[in-house]
Regions:
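Conserved GNAT-fold acetyl-CoA-binding loop/helix
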Residues: 31-51
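A short helix-loop-beta-strand connector motif used in the catalytic cores of GNAT acetyltransferases and
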Residues: 52-64
């Protein structure tokens, strides 16, 4: 099987129909789902509908994240709401397997995807949204260079509680400066 992108420890390839059951299984962890800003649990049928939408439109690109050593799916990542006239997209990244948390797999994935987004797809702007009480997620995105641009007050509701939704962005020129500084 060919892979779209790879780095030292991970491979990225487009989501395939055969991946949906495993993704639904990984996404069944309610605590992780809340951190991701989605309403969970996700059923296999909902995953199937998402997959079909990905196949029918050109406004989203979705990949599974695979650990090279075990050849197992550990998460998913992709661009959505791609709008090429403005060269913008929203970005999503989720390491669903807790065994891979805080070990650099998220950063490795983000680096591959940002390089792809800015250098291959020629995006000018990539945006993300982070649930406000996900302090670890906010620190992660800031460490990669994303900046806060606004807050949707009580923009996320889960388990009877509202949380703010923090909007963040990264522009191509900031990405290039950050990457060049890291190479020296």
């Amino acid at each position: 099987m060919s892979y779209f992108m790879e780095s030292e420890r991970i491979k990225l390839r487009p989501v395939q129909k055969d991946d949906l059951k495993k993704l639904a299984e990984l996404m069944s962890d309610r605590e992780i789902g809340v951190l991701s800003g989605e309403v969970y649990p996700i059923t296999e049928r909902e995953m199937d509908n998402f997959y079909d939408r990905c196949q029918k439109t050109d406004d989203r690109i979705w990949f599974v994240i695979i650990d090279k050593e075990t050849n197992s799916i550990i998460g998913e990542t992709g661009f959505l709401r791609i709008f090429m006239p403005w060269r913008t997209a929203d970005y999503s990244l989720m390491i669903w397997n807790r065994n891979y948390w805080a070990k650099g797999y998220g950063k490795e994935t983000a680096n591959l995807m940002l390089e792809y987004g800015f250098n291959s797809l020629n995006f000018h702007r990539i945006a993300i949204g982070v649930v406000g009480n996900n302090e670890r997620g906010l620190r992660f995105w800031k460490s990669i260079g994303f900046k806060e641009e606004g807050k949707q007050k009580d923009g996320f509701f889960n388990n009877g509680e509202y949380s703010d939704f923090i909007m963040m962005y990264l522009l191509d020129e900031k990405y290039r400066v950050t990457r060049n500084n890291n190479k020296t």
